[in-house]
Amino acid sequence: MELYLDTANVAEVERLARIFPIAGVTTNPSIVAASKESIWDVLPRLQNAIGEEGTLFAQTMSRDAKGMVEEAKRLNNAIPGIVVKIPVTAEGLAAIKLLKKEGIVTLGTAVYSASQGLLAALAGAKYVAPYVNRVDAQGGDGIRMVQELQTLLEHHAPDSMVLAASFKTPRQALDCLLAGCQAITLPLDVAQQMLNTPAVESAIEKFEQDWKNAFGNLNL
């Protein structure tokens, strides 16, 4: 299983990388824009934060296949081994096919249906990123879509994997893992929600109080 953080906040990546067993960091144009840093400045800093073994994801901006391929090559030259995120449009599918031949690893992003995700996988994307909460927000069933996509990939594109994205709650992320997803990416607020459990703090405080009442201190 691969766990990623969905952010370009270098300080938060450094903080959470000490706690979470993260495999790397995913970004998108909106996330990079929010950082107020040039993508060419922030990507090396993120790579340094996750270490040489961590995997970094960044997205192209062009709308046509030729431009996507050119941008993907620039990203790969800047950060060797980076996974290039390509929106799963008609032009995006063409770009994914071309990049597969070039040996550049891709992720099919902005996936709103299982069929769309399957096409990305068949085109050669190693990862496929369904937008769970955004599907829910449009009146769909994000978890069911992920379940369908996971089954399709297992049957027809076993070399590709679902990297589920767009979460508002830890429950959504867990449901994707229960559906068999091998990878998820968490926004910072959802990652923090997983850590903040009031009942745990209450239990620890009770342990400490009982120990102190018995022994007068909190030492072993």
Swiss-Prot record:
SUPFAM superfamilies: Aldolase. Its main location: cytoplasm. It catalyses: beta-D-fructose 6-phosphate = dihydroxyacetone + D-glyceraldehyde 3-phosphate. CDD domains: Transaldolase_FSA (cd00956). It is found in: Cytoplasm. InterPro entries: Aldolase_TIM, F6P_aldolase, TAL/FSA, Transaldolase_3B/F6P_aldolase, Transaldolase_AS, TSA/FSA_arc/bac. The active site is at K85. Its EC number is 4.1.2.-. One of its GO terms (cellular component) is cytoplasm. Catalyzes the reversible formation of fructose 6-phosphate from dihydroxyacetone and D-glyceraldehyde 3-phosphate via an aldolization reaction. NCBIfam families: fsa_talC_mipB, PRK12653.1. Belongs to the transaldolase family. Type 3A subfamily. This is Fructose-6-phosphate aldolase. It comes from Salmonella typhimurium (strain LT2 / SGSC1412 / ATCC 700720). The gene is fsa.
